[in-house]
Design a protein with these regions (language model features):
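Long, charged, low-complexity intrinsically disordered regions
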Residues: 1-77
Length: 77
């Protein structure tokens, strides 16, 4: 299932909390793919990676054509 979260312009603490709750809920679907829109804020993107995506060991990539987005997929355990 595909999910999309737009965090652009959101306060960083609220954005981290929202990303975490959506990714945890979405992770129950083994075919999950979530597009997280951070905008061009390198700080927000790095914090989402460091505080949500990496600790939960999700797979992710940042598309070269849209660096304000993180694509997250489920890592099979």
């Amino acid at each position: 299932m595909k999910f999309k979260i737009d965090l652009h312009g959101m306060p960083i603490t609220k954005a981290i909390s929202k990303a975490e709750s959506v990714l945890i809920e979405a992770s129950f679907d083994k075919n999950m793919q979530c597009e997280i829109i951070t905008g061009k804020s390198g700080n927000m993107q790095q914090r989402i990676l460091d505080e949500v995506i990496k600790p939960y060991k999700f797979d992710y990539y940042i598309p070269p054509h849209n660096t304000g987005t993180i694509i997250v997929t489920q890592n099979e355990l």
